[in-house]
Amino acid sequence: WRIGGIEREIPIIASAMDGVIDVKMAVQLAKLGAMGVLNLEGLQTRYEDPNPVLDKIASVSKTEFVTLMQDLYAKPIQPELITQRIKEIKSQGGIAAVSVTPAGASRFGDAIAAAGADLVFIQATVVSTAHLSPDSITPLDLAQFCQEMPMPVALGNCVTYDVALSLMKAGAAAVMVGIGPGAACTSRGVLGVGVPQATAVADCAAARDDYAQESGNYIPIVADGGLVTGGDICKCIACGADGVMIGSPFARAAEAPGRGYHWGMATPSPLLPRGTRIDVGTTGTLEQILRGPAQLDDGTHNLLGALRTSMGTLGAKNLHEMQQVDVVIAPSLLTEGKVYQKAQQLGMGK
C-alpha cells in the first residue's frame, strides 16, 4: 500500500506515542516493512536523553503518574532536537514520519521542513479545517500548510463523512480516522466526543470513494485506535480502511521505549488530562508482534500473518478486494462456542 507516496509492504503504522516510538523503533519498523511515527511534541524533543524520564514514568504508582507526567512534559520542546531526531531516523535507513498538533505545526513547521521529514501527521480532534490556537500562536490553516510543506501531510483525526471530505479537499495526503477508541485514551469519557470506530471508518471511506470519483485523487484513510488483535485489523480494513495505526500492540514489544507501559499523549495536559497510563506488559519482540512467529494464542502476535490469512480465507487478493467483503454486526461471534476458553482464560477468553 502507499501513503504520501511512500510504499510499504504492511498497512500498519505505529502510533505517535512516547511509549511506542523512539528513533530505534521507527528505524526497526521501517526495516520490517511497516512505519512508525515519532511525536515531535513528546519526550524525544524535550530531553536530549529521554531514558531516565521513561524510567521514572514506568516506576511510579497509579496515583502519582498524572502529576509526574504533567511535570515532565512541562519542559519546553527544543527545536534543535526536532532536527536531530529526524536526521537520526533518516541516517539509519528509517522513514522519518513525524506527528504534531495543529499548534505544533504552526510553531515547528519550518524546522520540520528544513530537517527533511518524509511525512508529517497533524493530529487532533478535528471538527473543521480551521483550528483555534492559543493567543500567542496564529491559527493553522490546514490547506495552506499542506500546500506550503515540501513533504506530504496526513490530517486527522476525524470520524464523519463531511469532515473527512473537507480534509481531503484541504490537501491531505491521508486522513486519520478515530476519536477516543485507543486503549490509553479517555477523550470519550472526559469530553463525551467520539464515534464507534467501525462506523467512523465506513463513513470516512465513503467520503474517500466519493472524493476519488469527483477528483480522480485517491486519498487513503487510516483507522487510528481501538485495534489490538489481528482480527481487529482485518475487520477495520473490511470496513473500508486502507491502513491502520496501532499503539498498545507495539507498546508490548521488547524494543518499545515505554518499559511495558503505554500512555495517551493527552495524559500530561496541565488543565484537562484525556489519557491514562496502562500496564500492557512485554510479550515479545517487535518482529514477533508484526511478522511472527507467534508465541501467543490471542491474536496479538503476527499481525501481518493474520491479515494475509484472513484475506486468503475471504478470497481477497489485495486490500481493495478486502474492503469489498461483506461485514456483519454479530457480537456473538466473540463468545459463540468459547465456553472453555472463557472459563480457562485462554485464547479469545482472556
What are these regions (language model features)?
Residues 1-214, 220, 250, 338:
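Active-site entrance/lid segments in N-terminal catalytic domains of soluble metabolic enzymes
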Residues 73-87, 150, 154, 192-223, ...:
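Alpha/beta catalytic cores of nucleotide-metabolism and tRNA/nucleoside-modifying enzymes
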